[in-house]
């Protein structure tokens, strides 16, 4: 089902709408956000210079460090009294990125997620079980309001407590599941251990995001649960989930082009690439009041497809993300940077400078092991000291990352040294891209 007429207007109409909204957004950002005004003034750029869509390439990029450097609200365009919701994502040095939504921003976010739900076939006859975390993470709330807008009944169970998830799934006859794909496969393992067959549940479709997943994972989810697996894409910096989404044709993720302009650039040079090219996707918001984002570099590698979809939607589609242009990892839906872990480790007495992160998949769930050298191997001879230090590291890392990790303490000079850049991460997971 097509929820909004904006999803099927002609390319000409969409470009005209985008240009009108782009002009408004750049004027708004320039006049309300000192960061943008200063940046533009330094290069002699004025909002009036944006006359055509192609002029967007004149606008300087915005990057994650810009938000971090202006923590918490330095890029906001409105005072806090006009913000009705704050969300945040983890930061690489302990400070998170904070975003704010005005009432209109919340309405547009809800609309984006309603389109996502509708594209997956969700209606007012469905019961949607949201197994995303609620809180500062945008995942749970975005889908919550979007699903309510299409009329679905929402079960905001949040993440974890798998036995409780399955109990409600059966008792309330949930038909839609919202979660990370790795958690879904974890649930199927528990179902099979308990003798719960797919015929014993009522799920028909999944709205999965927060991390990529392989075609093999999708095939397993669909086969073991008997559902249609749809993927979606979003970033906290833009709005959270709802930037783009799959329909039931599975031919790419439809971009909400009336809300965002997407470009593909060369991640090394920053030059805009021709249509059909694979590169880094860059997004510009078109309707944001709280914190407008102009040419935000996502670091995600993909391509954009412009031909109409068989579902009837004409908005452009982004391919599933093929990789990252930086060192960020996504573990159980959480953005993790090696520098976050390093920052924690370097602040603990007795810990050396050499460490390594081992990322694996166990029972379809991402796991991370932190291997770190000690300054003095004698600590390993004392069980109480070893246990205390291990617990301290685990606790401090969980405080920063919000995920549990395994910690292995090593003797000095255990890890391999190289003359070049140290290999901090060993990712043994099946590649999702």
Model-derived features with residue positions:
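AMP-binding/adenylate-forming
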Residues: 103-116, 127-186
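Short, well-ordered beta-strand segments
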Residues: 127-130, 282, 371
């Amino acid at each position: 089902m097509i929820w909004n007429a904006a999803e099927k207007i002609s390319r000409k109409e969409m470009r005209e709408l985008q240009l009108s909204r782009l002009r408004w957004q750049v004027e708004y950002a320039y006049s309300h956000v000192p960061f943008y005004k200063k940046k533009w003034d330094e290069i002699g750029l004025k909002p009036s210079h944006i006359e055509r869509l192609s002029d967007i390439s004149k606008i300087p990029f915005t990057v994650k460090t810009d938000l971090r450097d202006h923590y918490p609200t330095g890029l906001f365009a409105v005072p806090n009294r006009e913000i009705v919701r704050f969300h945040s994502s983890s930061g690489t040095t302990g400070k998170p990125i904070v975003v704010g939504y005005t009432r209109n921003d919340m309405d547009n976010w809800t609309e984006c997620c309603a389109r996502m739900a509708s594209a997956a076939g969700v209606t007012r006859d469905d019961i949607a079980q949201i197994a995303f975390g609620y809180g500062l993470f945008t995942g749970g709330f975005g889908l919550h309001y979007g699903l309510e807008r299409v009329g679905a009944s929402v079960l905001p169970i949040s993440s974890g407590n798998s036995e409780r998830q399955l109990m409600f799934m059966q008792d309330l006859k949930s038909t839609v599941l919202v979660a990370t794909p790795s958690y879904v496969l974890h649930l199927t393992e528990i179902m099979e251990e308990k003798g719960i067959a797919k015929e014993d549940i009522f799920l028909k479709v999944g709205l999965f995001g927060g991390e990529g997943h392989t075609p093999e994972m999708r095939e397993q989810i669909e086969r073991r649960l008997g559902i249609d697996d749809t993927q979606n894409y979003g970033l906290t910096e833009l709005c959270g989930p709802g930037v783009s989404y799959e329909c039931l044709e599975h031919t790419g993720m439809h971009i909400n082009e009336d809300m965002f302009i997407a470009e593909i650039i060369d991640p090394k040079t920053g030059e805009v690439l021709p249509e059909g090219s694979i590169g880094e996707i860059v997004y510009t918001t078109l309707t944001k009041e709280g914190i407008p984002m102009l040419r935000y570099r996502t670091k995600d590698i993909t391509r954009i497809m412009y031909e109409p979809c068989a579902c009837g939607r004409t908005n452009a589609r982004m391919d599933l993300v093929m990789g990252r242009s930086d060192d960020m990892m996504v573990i159980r839906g959480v953005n993790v940077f090696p520098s976050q872990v390093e920052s924690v480790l370097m602040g603990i007495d007795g810990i050396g400078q050499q460490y390594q992160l081992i990322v694996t998949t166990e029972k379809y769930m991402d796991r991370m092991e932190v291997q770190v050298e000690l300054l003095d191997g004698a600590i390993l001879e004392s069980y109480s000291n070893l246990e205390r230090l291990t617990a301290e590291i685990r606790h401090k890392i969980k405080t920063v990352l919000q995920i549990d990790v395994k910690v292995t303490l090593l003797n000095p000079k255990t890890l391999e040294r190289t003359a070049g850049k140290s290999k901090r991460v060993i990712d043994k997971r099946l590649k999702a891209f």
